[in-house]
Curated annotation (Swiss-Prot):
One of its GO terms (biological process) is nucleoside phosphate metabolic process. This is GDP-mannose pyrophosphatase. Gene3D superfamilies: Nucleoside Triphosphate Pyrophosphohydrolase. Mg(2+) 1 binds at A85, E104. It holds the Pfam family NUDIX. GDP-alpha-D-mannose binds at Y17, K38, R39, E40, R67, A85, G86, L87, E104, E127, D150, E151, K176. It comes from the Bacteria. The gene is nudK.
Amino acid sequence: MSLNVELIKDKILSENYFVLRNITYDLTRKDGEVVRHKREVYDRGNGAAVLLYNREKKSVVLIRQFRVATWVNGNPDGMLIEACAGLLDDDEPEVCIRKEAIEETGYRVNAAEKVFELYTSPGGVTELIHLFIAEYDDASRANEGGGVEDEEIEVLEMPFSEALEKVRQGVIRDAKTVLLLQHLQLRGIMD
């Protein structure tokens, strides 16, 4: 089913860190009725994430960092456990994950497998995130990780079974991370 959409107005409300826009559009429904909508859209750019895993050790590498949006939404300390990720800026997705993995986790990504790409919150956020998995070993450790500039990132290497248990307990609550962990489990990669 294809809908006819006509842009009426695109007004920038804020360009502080990302871009918040107010979009007015007419949507012609399949019965021919034209309905006008006004929505705010948050454009933060597209991103990429990678879950590092080690079959031999049956472990994964995750990070823990402060996320202000979770804190505003009731996460008491604002800390979130998640897969390594970053915004694409002008990079290709695989270039992005390689750069972010070194910066955040300290591990070099050798061979990466793209799993899928998903919209994070399509009701109001433009972001499309490219999700990867990549195997790591001790030899691929380049530095201690921890992020750059103003980032404060803790690197967490943990058993895969513990990561899955943290999902069940509600300790890991980041959508991309849950999807990537479940992807490893569904494919039997860590068996």
